[in-house]
Swiss-Prot record:
Its EC number is 1.1.1.27. It comes from Dissostichus mawsoni (Antarctic cod). The active site is at H192 (proton acceptor). CDD domains: LDH_1. GO terms for molecular function: L-lactate dehydrogenase activity. It catalyses: (S)-lactate + NAD(+) = pyruvate + NADH + H(+). Disulfide bonds: none annotated. Substrate binds at R105, N137, R168, T247. The keyword Cytoplasm applies. The gene is ldha. NAD(+) binds at residues 29-57, 98, 137. This is L-lactate dehydrogenase A chain. Homotetramer.
Amino acid sequence: MSTKEKLISHVMKEEPVGSRNKVTVVGVGMVGMASAISILLKDLCDELAMVDVMEDKLKGEVMDLQHGSLFLKTKIVGDKDYSVTANSKVVVVTAGARQQEGESRLNLVQRNVNIFKFIIPNIVKYSPNCILMVVSNPVDILTYVAWKLSGFPRNRVIGSGTNLDSARFRHLIGEKLHLHPSSCHAWIVGEHGDSSVPVWSGVNVAGVSLQGLNPQMGTEGDGENWKAIHKEVVDGAYEVIKLKGYTSWAIGMSVADLVESIIKNMHKVHPVSTLVQGMHGVKDEVFLSVPSVLGNSGLTDVIHMTLKAEEEKQLQKSAETLWGVQKELVL
C-alpha cells in the first residue's frame, strides 16, 4: 500500500466536475501577470488558465503562482496548447507586441492583428460560449478585430477601453479635491488613448456638478486649469513607460474589476469598448468606450450619455481616427 492509500479511504468514486467560473489569461507579459494576480487576489474564479507562446516564461510564471497555492483558493494551470483554456467563462487577451517608449497605440496595430489571427480562432475552438475581453493595444481596434475573427455576438466581445483612463481621471480629480476617487464621479469615453474624451459636463461629487460651480471647467478659459488633468490622464501611460519601461499594475486591477462584474453578474456600469455604430452620430463600424452594463452575459446594455455638442464632436472625431486605421487593416 502506498502512503496515500494508508492515509486516505475512498468513500465514493468522484465524477469529474468542470470548472464553474474558469478564467483564462492569454499572454504572460507584464499586463497578463498583473491581471492574473489581481484576479487571483480578488478570488474571482475556481480555475485560472494561462497560455503563451513563450514556453519557458509561461512555465516559470505558472510555477511561481502555483507555489503560492496555499494562500489562494484557485486552481492554476498553464500550457502553450489552447486546450488548457477549454470551457472558460471569460478569456482575457493581453498578448501582443508591446508599446515602445514614444510609440502611439495606433502604430502597434498591424503587428498585433497578425498575432490575433492565431489567438482568436484557438479561443473560439475551446471556449465557444466565453466572453472575450481584449486588453492588448490599440484596444479599440483590436476589439473590433477580435469581434470580426471570432464571429461572436457583440455582447460577448468587450475591450477594456477607458475603464483605466476613467480610473486615472477620478484619481487625479480626487487628488485635486482631496477626496477618495470613488467619491469623484467622472467618465472618459471614446478611444483608449490619445483621442479620449473627458465628459466634463458629467463630473460630480455627491450629485453636485463641478461644471455647475465652475462653468469654464475643462476649457481653455478656466483659471484653475482643470483641463491639465485630462492631459495627465493621456500622458500617464507614456510617463509610466518612460520611468519603468511598461505599465502593469493599474491595468491589471482594471481588468480584475471588469472580470468581477461579469463573473458576479453585478450589472455594474463601466466605460468599456463596444460597437458604437449608430450612437452619438457615429456612422462607421467602430468600437469605442461608452458607459456599459456588464453581467453574466457580457455587455447587456449601453447608457445613453447626455453629451454637450463639443463632447459629441470629439467622440465622432475619435471614431473617424479609428476608422481611418481600421479600413486599412488586412484581416
